[in-house]
């Protein structure tokens, strides 16, 4: 079945990889310390879907891992623009700012991450209470 083909075999047979396959390839390459190739794979995933959150997260982390903090910050900002309620995106961007010495920016984004975390926790507590009351 064509859906069962590995990404490399699919390419050899002329089929384009999906964004998920490019993302998975990027993860494998990053695990092998092939950062340039991982970056290229994530960029191919993002060419198909510029707001693909998993690829944006991964690309930002690869850039940060090789001290390309300007690039990590730019991708982190793109991720937040695409997913403004993403707590992890805010936390990561705060870390990138901090590592670059941009403390005021790090604190501002970090505060937003904490606020999003509190909102998530409140919503989880509300849902737990609702589930409990429905059982009774």
Question: Residue locations for each model-derived region?
Answer:
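Structural signature of tandem alpha-helical TPR/SEL1-like repeats
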Residues: 31-43, 66-78, 100-112, 117
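Terminal, low-structured helical/coil segments at or just beyond the last alpha-helical repeat
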Residues: 2, 9-19, 95-136
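Alpha-helical segment of the N-proximal tetratricopeptide repeat
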Residues: 18-48
């Amino acid at each position: 079945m064509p859906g069962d083909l590995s990404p490399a075999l699919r390419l050899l047979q002329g089929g384009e990889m999906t964004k998920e396959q490019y993302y998975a390839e990027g993860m494998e390459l990053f695990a092998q310390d092939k950062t340039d190739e991982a970056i290229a794979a994530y960029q191919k995933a993002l060419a198909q879907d510029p707001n693909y959150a998993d690829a944006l997260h991964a690309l930002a982390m690869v850039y940060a891992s090789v001290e390309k903090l300007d690039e990590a910050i730019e991708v982190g900002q793109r991720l937040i623009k695409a997913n403004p309620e993403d707590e992890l995106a805010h936390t990561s961007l705060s870390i990138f700012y901090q590592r670059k010495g941009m403390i005021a920016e790090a604190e501002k984004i970090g505060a937003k991450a904490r606020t999003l975390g509190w909102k998530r926790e409140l919503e989880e507590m509300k849902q737990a209470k609702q589930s409990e009351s429905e059982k009774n």
